[in-house]
Amino acid sequence: MYYLKNTNFWMFGLFFFFYFFIMGAYFPFFPIWLHDINHISKSDTGIIFAAISLFSLLFQPLFGLLSDKLGLRKYLLWIITGMLVMFAPFFIFIFGPLLQYNILVGSIVGGIYLGFCFNAGAPAVEAFIEKVSRRSNFEYGRARMFGCVGWALCASIVGIMFTINNQFVFWLGSGCAFILAVLLFFAKTDAPSSATVANAVGANHSAFSLKLAL
């Protein structure tokens, strides 16, 4: 039970919990939001999901490369967290109105945001925390379990909230994102001194090239 005294175990376990809590507010209810709230047809729904998949495919290799380059630095997670803070304003004031204005424009904008934050963002978050688990000596699977609990709990809560007012769901997601920011701020991922020296002299970095990116 040594991991219970590990601060990073709790920090990133809770990060998983709230990140997947937000995902649980998005994935199961997104088709319902499109059809019942925005009255999007099935064919247009297909366009939206195709755009999300397209941008996910574009972002995932980039995130993989950035994750390797950044190591234990939290820059990418800060960007993802910052975008998740805008979860409610994006859905309520940007994505929904854009879908009513022009389905293609709305699909592109939604594909970029959702592909970045979730479809490509989730693997980047998991890869980062896996690195932290090795650095901080806690089992990744135990921290990842927090995410499963967060998703399951959210599905129960959001299902009730959605029937009352669908906007509550998005504001709940933004509130959870603020908690992510607090957790990320206090989490310590400093590399050990030997690794820091190796990074400083470039021993742990390969030269960037187009071949590497592809």
Language-model regions, residue ranges each:
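Helix-to-loop junctions at the C-terminal end of transmembrane segments
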Residues: 58-72, 161-163
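Hydrophobic core of transmembrane alpha-helices in multi-pass small-molecule transporters
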Residues: 17, 87, 99-124, 128
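Cytoplasmic membrane-interface "Motif A"-like loop-to-helix N-cap segments
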Residues: 68-82
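Residue-level signature of mid-helix packing/kink "hotspots" within the transmembrane helices
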Residues: 53-61, 151-152, 156
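Juxtamembrane intracellular "pre-TM" segments in multi-pass secondary transporters
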Residues: 1-7, 187-214
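C-terminal ends and interior cores of transmembrane alpha-helices
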Residues: 81-101
